[in-house]
Regions:
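Conserved acyl-donor/pantetheine-binding loop and adjacent beta-alpha core of acyl/acetyltransferases
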Residues: 52-85
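Conserved beta-strand-loop-alpha-helix junction that forms the acyl-donor binding cleft
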Residues: 90-93, 116-129
Length: 158
């Protein structure tokens, strides 16, 4: 992972505001270190995209979105894992990388009930809404944090 960190940070920056903005590669590393991180790479082992998964109850992960899913999980009496972010390099988009990352997550999450993800509605990220809906995610809630930031919460049965 340390060798890939610079490339993952570049992918993350190019994907903002669709994913959380980080001020530095070390800022991104902080979240990666708390997560399960899967990386898709090309034949030369250059990263094309990545997805990070956070276990509910990870208190070191300071995220109102994770806290929302923890409350939803408790209300629904279910087992869930949270997608912190999925990001694909601009030149690799439209080639199935994001779907391949999610398919890998579905495999390693066997035995879990749900996968949770949030998608921006303000600023809107219509491509991500379509992508998640196409993969079977259902909208289960929304939250407005500010006039410039609102999210939709999606879950998918695994």
């Amino acid at each position: 992972m340390p060798d890939d960190l610079g490339a993952l940070y570049t992918i993350n920056r190019a994907s903002t505001p669709g994913v959380g903005s980080e001020a530095s590669a070390e800022g991104l590393k902080r979240w990666i270190d708390l997560s399960t991180c899967l990386v898709a790479a090309d034949a030369d082992d250059h990263p094309l995209g990545f997805i990070t998964l956070i276990e509910p109850g990870t208190l070191a992960y300071e995220s109102a979105n994770l806290r929302w899913f923890e409350a939803w999980q408790k209300t629904a009496s279910c087992d869930l894992i949270y997608v912190d972010r999925i990001a694909v390099a601009a030149h690799a988009r439209g080639n199935g990388i994001g779907e391949a990352l999610y398919r890998a997550v579905f495999e390693i999450s066997a035995g879990r009930q749900f996968l949770g993800a949030e998608v921006n509605t303000v600023p809107d990220n219509p491509g991500s809404h379509r992508f998640h809906q196409r993969l079977g995610f259902k909208d289960v809630g929304r939250r407005r944090y500010a006039s410039t930031y609102e999210v939709a919460y999606y879950v998918r049965e695994i």
